[in-house]
Amino acid sequence: MASLLLAAFFVVVATDARPTPHPLDLVARAFDARDRYANFPTYDQLPLHPSFPTKAAWGVWGASDEFGALNHITRATRLAARSEIQTGRAISLNLALGVPDPPINPQRPPLIHAIQPFAGYQDDILTLNTQISTQFDGLRHFPYSTNFEQSTYQFYNDLITFDDIVAPGGTSTLGIQNAAQKGIAGRGVLLDWGGWKDAMNETYDAFSTIIIPTTELDAVARWQGLDPAAFTVPGDFLVVRTGFMKQYTALSAHAQAVLPFREGAAVQWVGVEASDATLRWLWDKKVALVGADNPTFESAPLSGVIDGAVRNLHMVFIGGWGQSIVEFMDLDELAATCHALKRFHFFFTLQNLNVVGGIASPPNAMAIL
């Protein structure tokens, strides 16, 4: 009986993360699925309350929403994306589960794959950190914080606290089961920044801080024959190829082994700029998901000035907008195919693990052209 009472206590505490009344109760948009963009705020109108974190979209989809940017996905967007399937060619966007090896983040242990034989059959046993390879970042992964102090964590819609994740009997709120049950499918669009640089005979080091601004992403769109003002529609999945994995794959085994052990300011790689310009550009496009072939979508070190504050895209995307990120995508075959077909839109699917209360997952992502 005592254990049952203790479990009940933890559940009650964990589900009462927000104070009452909460500013969200005052400013949350009355979201109507029949007209999901009625009274939709502009980027300049974020956040909806001055007490919310930098450019947070808390309340935009309702005070208790757990889907965030996935609300841009509808039956209509999925149906419209069917027209992108013209050849039937399917391309996996996932690296082998043990790649990179060792993991780029040295705090994450590498994959352990064991075979368990039985009489007449064999099983696998996998022990892995879900973010060592191609990965889908869920909404419990990267909150707002000050100097990464746990006491300052702020998660999407202020629905949970750090203790709700790690304490016994914590909630499943904002877990990756939401994305798994939502059904992530629709139209994808590739911006091949790495190919664009190659076409201009401009060499670059993907393992250095090269910041990709939206002006260059628009230039890539034009180079691909797309209209920068109209190459996306709400609910699209935007994928950027930086060339990071192409350069990584070409390394010697020794160079791959030492790359993760850079420290401090030496931890650098190419990626999208963390700035108001980037966030405004993406907010206006109403994309459901972003992804790239680098470790973080944004450039490293992860830092930029957003609305006058030192922030990064991870904080605003995940903690602010409820927008997941797919990282370490395998995009080289997709890019080659898109260039050959002269088409850069495709049908995109992603089915993450249905782990209740999960933080991240291999994405099992696929493009069908």
Provide a role label for each language-model segment:
Residues 18-369:
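Active-/binding-site microenvironments in catalytic and ligand-binding cores
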Residues 1-21:
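Fungal secretory targeting signals
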